[in-house]
Amino acid sequence: VASTDTPSVLTDGIRVGSNSELVIEESEIRLPHLRGIRVGGNGSIAVRDSDLHTYGIFMDETVHTITDAKTLKKLEITDSTVLTGDIIGARGEYSSVEEIVIRGSSIRLNDEYTYNRCTIGGGEQASFGSIDIQDSQIDITSSLNAPIGSGLRSSTDRESRIRIANSQVSVRNLKFGPAIGSGYTSHGGRMDIIIENSTVTAKGGSLRSDSDYIPGIGKNASGCKTVIGIQILNSTVDSFRLEEKDGTNYVYDDLHTKELPGIPAENISICGSTVNGTRIDHTFD
C-alpha cells in the first residue's frame, strides 16, 4: 500500500473508529508525511510480519477531563520493521494504553521527522500499564515524553511496568526528561523498569537549571513524583545525563552507584551486568 495523498492536516493515513480492532499482516505500507495508523478509543492494533513507514501507530483521543479518558487496549508489533515519526501507543490528553507488546521487531525514528516526539508508551498526560519489548532493536528520540515510558505531565495512580529483554535499545530524550521512565512533571503511581539480557544506551534530556538532574533511566528528580524501581540483569547499560544547563556534554549518571536523586538505593537492583562501565556481579538486594 502506497499513499499519495496531498498533504493536509485534515487527512488521515489509516484510521478506524472506537471499539475497533485494526490488524496489519504480511504487508508493506508507505504513508506520506504526517500520515499515521490510528484507532479510536477502546480499540486495539496488531502489526505482524510487516514493513511500515508511518507517522505513528496509536490511539488518538483527546478529552478535557480524566473522567472522560480513553484507553487503547493493546498494541502488538511482531516480526515487523517500523520507521516512524510519532507515538507508538496512546496519544492525546488523559489517554492511556493498557499493553504494548513488541516482539522480534525493529523500530526507529524517521530522520525526516527530526522535530517530532517518538514515544513508545503514552503521549502528553497519558499513562500506560505495561510495555514489553523482546528480541527487538529500538532506536528513537523524543522530547518531554520519555522515548520509552510515560508522557509529559502524566498523572496516574496505577502501577506501570517496562520490560526490555534480549534486545538492543538506543534512546534519547532531547528535553527535560529521561530516555526510559517517567515523562517530565509526571506524578503518581509506581513504575518498574526491568532490563535483562540486553544492551541499552539511554540519554537524558536538557536541564531546566544547573541544579537539575535528569538521568538516562528513571525520572527527573525535581519534577516527577512517580515511585521508580529499576532492575538490571545480565545486561550492558550506559545511562547518561547532561552535565549542565544549555550544555552538550554527556556524562554517566549515578545508576551504577544507586545514587539517582529521588530514587532510593533499595529500589535499584543490579546483577551480572556492566552499568556505566562498571561491572557489578553481586546478587539482587
How should these model regions be labeled?
Residues 1-33, 38-143, 148-176, 180-241, ...:
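Surface-exposed loop/turn motifs in large extracellular/passenger domains
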